[in-house]
């Protein structure tokens, strides 16, 4: 994602030429907090403008149509203008402009959307109750945001669970807004050691992250704004399999939505990821075989503790290989053994054997991180141990990890993606409605 900042700068420069007056005399762009939120063009039709951290060290405004799946990172221009190009991170030519109407406190109340060869469309901002919150897991204080419809009613809740890496409350894209638009109260929080949360992410294990998720559920359960016994989990990637571990230890969890999370042993997932990424980037069979041999050897050393000297020699000889950036690696035997014990040896499907709530799992057929067929098979078998047949899975064609439309799944296609998988929002909405109906009957 190194090109994100450059492309956004290009879009901002292009926008400056659209100003009716010189940019220096234009009002400052609105803060992201003042314009971010959910907008509606007509009953049942919603647009998410989410504050989004794509990993480049800055927050951006992300436009998502919660019907069609159209998704764009927006760049600020002069005054109240934001705009986007023809694809997610492709800034030019400009194809969409957004301008805001604001109240006396500078909060956006509505927006006007202008697209090429289309009539201007107006969207009203949906009133939401957004609160900064903190909760604790032991000595670790975690900070986040709780958002719900501003109607004074109690709402079912959703706790969002992160994928791997130093992610924060702004890492989920449009998914929190989707749930809020459907009447849920949504808790997002900064992963320990990121944002405003305390703790040390590098020193944490999956067990720590599961405990953080449990603490989030307990915090939400104690809120007077939440319907008792109606808190679900939505996890992305690694968060998708952490959701099972959280629910296994908290039978009150009402449902799980697994967004492209893997349910195979982590070592197996890493082998799949290595091969799938290299094939998507058209590496040769010999390069793929060499990479898989390295990862297999690495895991054997991590498991047994024997053979580090030989592995380290291979590491030193392989740093210029084409496949090097696609494989896991450790700096010492102690580090490798730690990761084997706390990560690579973990089988996420085991906690699922204790889960009795409804489960929805959504994947892209071109996912280069999650082995989709094996994951679905393992999820179904694990849930059967708990006599849980309330399992629904769906695999979207031409979608990758993250459910963006792609051609091969290669990471360099992400900036050029134009939308999330068609029928994603309809699939989620339909399943949530059916789950709610079952609870009422």
Whereabouts are the PLM-identified features?
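Short beta-strand/loop motif that positions the catalytic acidic residue
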Residues: 355, 361-363
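Accessory cap/linker subdomain of secreted extracellular hydrolases
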Residues: 257-354
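The serine-hydrolase catalytic nucleophile loop
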Residues: 165-177, 191
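Short beta-strand element of the alpha/beta-hydrolase
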Residues: 154-163
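Conserved alpha/beta-hydrolase
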Residues: 179-196
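Alpha/beta-hydrolase active-site loop
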Residues: 204-224
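Catalytic active-site module of serine/aspartate enzymes centered on a nucleophile-bearing elbow/loop
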Residues: 399-402, 408-441
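Peripheral terminal and inter-domain segments
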Residues: 20-136, 150
